[in-house]
Structures are given as structure tokens and as C-alpha cells.
Curated annotation (Swiss-Prot):
The keyword Lipoprotein does not apply. Pfam families: RBFA (PF02033). It is found in: Cytoplasm. SUPFAM superfamilies: Ribosome-binding factor A, RbfA. GO terms for cellular component: cytosol. This is Ribosome-binding factor A. Belongs to the RbfA family. One of its GO terms (biological process) is maturation of SSU-rRNA. HAMAP family: RbfA. The keyword Cytoplasm applies. GO terms for molecular function: ribosomal small subunit binding. Monomer. Binds 30S ribosomal subunits, but not 50S ribosomal subunits or 70S ribosomes.
Length: 130
């Protein structure tokens, strides 16, 4: 079983190379029309399986379509990856939508709403005291 350092190095290499493949070799219109980024790579300890989390500026429906198209093209992506890196076996890959960014944005929106409500409440209290 590889150590954490090796996992981190291989994950970093995979992220770099897959990003280059998405930018230069893959011809999917949705990817070229929207900003698509690899946010995270989960690589199994045996280096055989790789989950690639994608973020995008696209709407939710389009994001799901992007992930679906990437999963359809994963065999050609894996083939290109095999040509670019030296590994005994290129890991099986699966693309997933990274919902962490969306959840974070919704939490920030809720916090802003609470802040605005609190400010409005404070203004009403000051007006009532006057």
C-alpha cells in the first residue's frame, strides 16, 4: 500500500494531466462553453480507482450534463492519460459533481440574509427608542 506522500504526488499528477486533457484534447462543447475545474481527486490506496470532482460556473442541469459527458468520454480520457504518465496501471476514473462549492455558497447566502435581518432589526430598535 502506497504511503500518503505517494498518494498526494500521484493525485497531483493526475489532476494536472487530466486538466490538460480536458483543455486541449477533449472536444465537448459544454466544457468549452463553461468554466470547468477539477476541484478534488480521491485516489484509492491501491491507485486503482480515481474519483474526480468537477466544479463549474454552469447551472445545475448543465453541470449534470457535463459530468455525464465526461463519464461517457472517460475511456478516451484514460487512454490519453496512459500516454502521458508512466504508471503500471492507469486508474479507473469516474467524474462527479462537486456539491461542496454550491453548499458553501448557499451557506454564505444564508449568513448574508441573517446579517441583513439583524441590521434591519437593530435599525427598528433604534427608531423605537427615539
Amino acid at each position: 500500500m502506497p504511503n500518503n506522500y505517494r498518494l498526494a504526488k500521484v493525485s497531483s499528477l493526475l489532476k494536472k494531466e487530466i486538466t490538460l486533457i480536458l483543455q486541449n484534447e477533449l472536444e465537448i462543447d459544454l466544457i468549452s462553453d463553461h468554466f470547468v475545474n477539477i476541484s478534488k481527486i480521491d485516489l484509492s490506496g491501491d491507485l486503482q480507482h480515481c474519483k474526480i470532482y468537477i466544479t463549474s460556473t454552469a447551472q445545475e442541469k448543465v453541470k449534470k450534463e457535463i459530468v455525464s459527458n465526461l463519464n461517457t468520454a472517460k475511456s478516451s480520457i484514460r487512454h490519453s492519460l496512459g500516454k502521458r504518465i508512466e504508471m503500471r496501471r492507469v486508474p479507473e476514473i469516474i467524474f462527479k459533481d462537486d456539491v461542496v462549492l454550491d453548499k458553501g455558497l448557499s451557506v454564505l447566502k444564508l449568513l448574508d440574509e441573517l446579517k441583513n435581518k439583524n441590521q434591519n432589526h437593530n435599525v427598528e430598535d433604534e427608531d423605537a427608542k427615539s
